[in-house]
Each structure stands twice: as structure tokens, then as C-alpha cells.
Regions:
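Iron-sulfur-associated redox domains of electron-transfer enzymes in respiratory
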Residues: 1-354, 358, 372
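Residues immediately within or flanking Cys/His clusters that coordinate Zn2+
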Residues: 23, 294-297, 358-364, 368, ...
Length: 470
């Protein structure tokens, strides 16, 4: 970095020093874009010298983490460039990358990165002239955006007051109704064990505090009397199914409506087999988060879903359930209004909001531990050759960790909100996850709870949108 660039990066005031020039990192495909850049050089085409290239075998190998690292290390802009669709030397690498970067681009805009800083282009080996043109346009765009905002905590900033969330939530159940559901649940769990349908039942047991429950693993029918049900049943029990299957061929799991998406996701991704599970869906009154209902419950009906094997309600236990009404499934999420409000704010205000959120992160990784779909044997944050995500509690590292975790869950997140619930710093991880879910649904449709459908970001279509690609 030049002295002017260092000064601009540290100031965070939005002013542009007189001698400032943008630093741009280009992640390029070896077979096409790198060759196109080489052709531009050998034919002596002139273009700005602000770009530093990093060569990859394929755009499909370019992780969004590398873009984040470029910004973290002081780049003012990033260009990603590869082969045209249909020309990939690895057949479909750029098609998968196109979907991935479509969603990642939306997230970067949401957290306050001006999209003038982030560009994508198809440049073939024979398009030296296009490479020179793209670099010129990207440089001008980043120059207009100015120095990258500081990752530091925005001291003296009053923050943003988000709109209040509203929603009716599930049907209210009185104490007698909850007791009836609990008794029916105990009966169903006992019959599952005595009938040999499963070797273990994962449910909720009494905790050490009032209105608190803990995960309970039952292998004897007599212990089913310990099962509890109510608004203190917060945990997503699908997190524990994998370890239980290490000891038993089949496992039964008690599931709220919001837990079913995680179960479907684990089956979809080959982490579980449907025949290994007995899913006990229970009529849910919503769970408490402090004095009121949890955010995720405000737009939930609490009804079980046909993915369940057994359905427990006030009226008893039955082997299957009717499909909830389309209206119940399509109820707007209570967080959507807050997301829409954030999107109306200028980029710098959004950036300050999220930097303040990420600045509180303790790097305890409770979000990772609670998430049913964070199942990698070695997380990217634990890999240190090289150390992709800084482990210290600093602002660039905190931002990279929280953003890349959300990206890894894009198109997969079930919306159970366990990450936000267990976060000791109260970071609004649920807003990021919900924003990505909305964008995936808008671009590629909704997969719902069908475990046979592919996740959007491991699939592609030749006709996928690419209006943002140069």
C-alpha cells in the first residue's frame, strides 16, 4: 500500500486523499481470463495498472472467503473473472460459481459493501481487448467508490433502530392442553421404544431452571415419563441425531415445526438416511425467548408437517399428518420488514451497523456448535495452513468469520435461529440468514422440506441470471 492508501484505510471518514489510487485484486481463471490478460499484454494494449492478479484453475475453485480476505487485507475492489458459460475446461465450474457469486454479491450489498467495489466478468483467452476494457471500467468504478471503509468499531455512532416485529404466532395452548400433549408424547415415545421402531428417543427433559429444558436421550420406555413439552423446549434436537446414530441403528427425534427443515437438510446432504429416523412431530405453542415469543415463532403456525412419522397433538397420536395449508406455509416472516428497512439505508450506514454487530463477536463459536448444518469435521476457522480466518477477536477477522459462515449456509439454512439464540453477544445472525434465504428463493425458487430436491447452490441452469456479469 502507498502512504495515501494507508491513510485512507485508517481514516474511515469517507474523504479521498489527493494521491489515492485504488488497489484492486483480480481472481482469474487460468485457462481463459489469465490468458486473455496475457494477450492484452503481448498486444501492448494499455489499461490501468491498479489490478493485481491471482490465478486459479477455475472460477469454481474461487471461494467467497478469498474475496473477503482481499477486502480484509486492504483491497479497495475485487474482480472475479473466468470462462464464458459453456467454455469451462472443467465443464460446469463457472456455472456453479455463477450461482454462488450471485448470492454472495447480494449479501455484500446487504452488509454495506458498495457493489462498485465488486465485479464479475467473462473473459476468454482470445479477448485481450475485453480484458483491457473490463479493467478500465472496474478501476473507474472503484475509484468512484473511494477507499474501502474501515473495519473498526464505529465509535460515537448511535446505531439504527429497527422496526418492531409483529406476528400472531402459533395457536395459544393453555396448561391443560400442554399437559395433554406432554402425556401423548410420552405415550408415543414409549410405544416407539417398546415396539422396536428405534433404539433411542431424543426429546426434552427438565432443566435446572424454571421454564428451561435440556436435550434428553432415552433408551428405556420407563424413562419416557421424564419427557417434557412446552415453551421452554428451545433446542433444535436434530443437532444430536448424528451422534445418537453412532450407537443405535434407528433413532426417534422429537421435532418442532422449525426443526424439520434441518432434518430435511441433513437427509438431502447425505448426513442422515430417512430410514434411520422416526420423526415425532409435536403441535408447538411457540418457544419463549425472554418475556415473549421467539422471533421465528411470530410467523409460524406450529403445525407438524407430512415429513413426520408420528404426530402428537392435544387430541392424541396419529401415524401421519395432513399437509398444512398453503397460507400457513407462505406466511411472511416477521424479520422481512427489518431486512427491507436496512436495505433502504445508505451503504455506509449499513456497513456501520454490521461492523458494530460483528465487533461484539467473542469468537466462542456457539453459533457453529448449535447449528445442525455446521457438521464439517474441521471448520475453515480451525484450519491454519494457511490461516484463512484470523482467530483473534478483531474486527476484520470477526467480519470474515460471520460472513463466511452465513455464505456456507446460503440455500441450506432451515431458519431454526439456533445460532442467534445461543449467541452471547446477541448478534443479529438471523437477519443475515433470512436475507440469504430470501435471495435464494427469489433467484432459484423454494425447495421447502423435500429432502429429494437439491440445494440451490449445488445446482445450476444454463439460463441462470447473470445481468451483473461484465
Amino acid at each position: 500500500m502507498t502512504e495515501a492508501n494507508v491513510t485512507a484505510a485508517q481514516s474511515g471518514t469517507g474523504s479521498v486523499p489527493e494521491n489515492w489510487k485504488p488497489h484492486i485484486v483480480a481472481l482469474v481463471c487460468n485457462w481463459c481470463s489469465y490468458a486473455g490478460a496475457d494477450m492484452a499484454g503481448t498486444t501492448r494494449l494499455e489499461y490501468p495498472a491498479n489490478v493485481r492478479m491471482v490465478r486459479f484453475p477455475c472460477t469454481g475453485r474461487m471461494s467467497p472467503l478469498m474475496i473477503l480476505r482481499a477486502f480484509e487485507q486492504g483491497a479497495d475492489g475485487v474482480l472475479v473473472s473466468g470462462c464464458h458459460p459453456g467454455d469451462c475446461h472443467y465443464v460446469q465450474g463457472n456455472l456453479v460459481a455463477r450461482r454462488r457469486f450471485t448470492i454472495f454479491r447480494s449479501l455484500m450489498d446487504f452488509i454495506g459493501i458498495d457493489l462498485k467495489r465488486l465485479h464479475f466478468a467473462w473473459v476468454s483467452a482470445a479477448e485481450g481487448h475485453k480484458w483491457a476494457k473490463v479493467v478500465s471500467e472496474v478501476t473507474a468504478s472503484v475509484q468512484e467508490a473511494g477507499p474501502l471503509p474501515s473495519f473498526d468499531h464505529p465509535e460515537g455512532w448511535d446505531g439504527i433502530d429497527l422496526p418492531e416485529m409483529a406476528g400472531s404466532g402459533p395457536q395459544e395452548l393453555d396448561e391443560d392442553q400442554l399437559n395433554a400433549i406432554r402425556d401423548n408424547l410420552r405415550k408415543a415415545a414409549s410405544e416407539v421404544l417398546t415396539g422396536g421402531r428405534a433404539g433411542s428417543v431424543i426429546g426434552y427433559g427438565p432443566g435446572s431452571l424454571a421454564n428451561q429444558t435440556i436435550p434428553l436421550f432415552i433408551t428405556e420406555a420407563a424413562d419416557c415419563e421424564k419427557l417434557e413439552w412446552g415453551q421452554g423446549c428451545r433446542n433444535n434436537l436434530s443437532t444430536y441425531v448424528g451422534s445418537a446414530l453412532d450407537k443405535h441403528e434407528r433413532v426417534a427425534v422429537v421435532a418442532k415445526t422449525c426443526d424439520l427443515g434441518a432434518i430435511s437438510g441433513l437427509i438431502r446432504e447425505g448426513q442422515l438416511r430417512r430410514e434411520q429416523l422416526v420423526v415425532i412431530g409435536v403441535q408447538c405453542p411457540g418457544v419463549r425467548d425472554g418475556p415473549g415469543l421467539a422471533t421465528k415463532c411470530l410467523s409460524c403456525s406450529g403445525d407438524p408437517h407430512p415429513i413426520c412419522d408420528l404426530v402428537v397433538t392435544v387430541d392424541g397420536v396419529r401415524e401421519s399428518c395432513e399437509d398444512p395449508s398453503a397460507a400457513a406455509l407462505d406466511t411472511p416472516d416477521a424479520r422481512d420488514e427489518q431486512i427491507a428497512y436496512l436495505e433502504t439505508l445508505p451503504h455506509d450506514e449499513r456497513w456501520k451497523y454490521w461492523q458494530r454487530q460483528f465487533g461484539r463477536c467473542l469468537r466462542c463459536y456457539a453459533c457453529r456448535a448449535a447449528c445442525p448444518l455446521c457438521y464439517c469435521s474441521t471448520c475453515i476457522t480451525d484450519k491454519h495452513r494457511p490461516q484463512w480466518v484470523p482467530t483473534s477477536i478483531d474486527h476484520p477477522g470477526n467480519s470474515t468469520w460471520n460472513i463466511i459462515r452465513a455464505v456456507h449456509l446460503a440455500g441450506r439454512c432451515s431458519g431454526c435461529d439456533e445460532c442467534a439464540r445461543v449467541c452471547p453477544a446477541d448478534i443479529r445472525l438471523d437477519l443475515i440468514n433470512r436475507k440469504l434465504s430470501l435471495e435464494v428463493e427469489r433467484q432459484y425458487g423454494k425447495i421447502g422440506l423435500d429432502p429429494e430436491k437439491k440445494s440451490a447452490l449445488v445446482d445450476f441452469r444454463m439460463e441462470d441470471s447473470e445481468e451483473f456479469i461484465l
